[in-house]
C-alpha cells in the first residue's frame, strides 16, 4: 500500500503539472497497480528503450487520463525513471532490519541497544536523490493549498492532501468540503483525517474488498431495476372452427351441417334419362 501511495502521489503531481485541465477522476487504485506492476517488471535498472514499451504504456494511460498521449515521450521516460528510484528507496527502507551480532554456530556477546539499531539504520539509509527533493518542492509550489489542508486536518498526510486538492482541481474550498462531507475516497490506504468520517472515506477493509470492487466497477442496469414486471394475461384460444364432418366439407364459420343425401335404389337410377346429346364425329 505504501508503494501504491507513492505511485499515486507521483502520477497526480505529474499530470497536474503537464495537463492542468485534465480530468483526474480516472486515476484510481487500478491504474496505480498497473504502473507499479510495470515498474516491478522492469526491475531496479528502471525503464529503457530495450525493456520498456512506451507506446503501450502511453496508450493505457491515455484511456484513463485523456490527453496523456500529448506529453512528450522523453518527459514520460524521465518521470518513470525518477519513480523507479523512489520505489527502490522505499523497498530498501521496508526491507531494512537491524543486523544481529549472532553468527551461525556462535552466541551473541551482548544484544544491541535501541540507539545502536537507530544509528545503524541511519547509516545504511541511502542518501536521497537531489531530483526527489526538487520534485517534492515543485509539487508543494504547484499545489499551494496543501499547507492549509495540513493545518486544518493535522492527521492528513502530504500525499492525501495533494490527492484531494488535485481532485478538486486546485479549489481549496471544494477540497475542504470533500474532506468534511466524505465525498472523496482518497488515495490507497487512506485512513481519513479523523475516525468520525464515513467508512467509504477510509477505504475498504479486507473483508469488504470484493463487494467494494463489485459495487464500483460492476455494470448495473438501473433502468431495469425501476421497471415493474407485469406479465400479460394469456390470451384465450380462438374458437376452433369445424371444416370437415364425416369427410364432408362444411362452412368455415363453425356451423355444423352437412349435405345429407338419401340413398337411391338401382331401379330408380334406371329410369333416369340423359338429355345431353351425343357427340357427332365427322370423318374426313
Swiss-Prot record:
Q: Where in the cell is it found?
A: Cytoplasm; Nucleus
Q: Which Gene Ontology BP annotations are present? A: negative regulation of cytokine production involved in inflammatory response; negative regulation of macrophage cytokine production
RNA-binding listed as a keyword? no
Q: Which residues form the CUE domain?
A: 141-184
Q: Where is this region: Disordered?
A: 183-204
The source's domain of life comes to Eukaryota
Q: Name one GO molecular function term.
A: ubiquitin binding
GO CC annotation terms, alphabetical: cytosol; nuclear membrane; nucleoplasm
Kindly state which keywords UniProt assigns to this record, in alphabetical order: Cytoplasm, Nucleus, Ubl conjugation pathway
Family (UniProt): Belongs to the CUEDC2 family.
Name the job this protein performs. Controls PGR and ESR1 protein levels through their targeting for ubiquitination and subsequent proteasomal degradation.
Kindly state the subunit structure of this protein. Interacts with PGR and ESR1.
Its domain comment says:
The CUE domain mediates interaction with PGR and ESR1.
> What protein is this chain from?
CUE domain-containing protein 2
Species this protein is from: Mus musculus
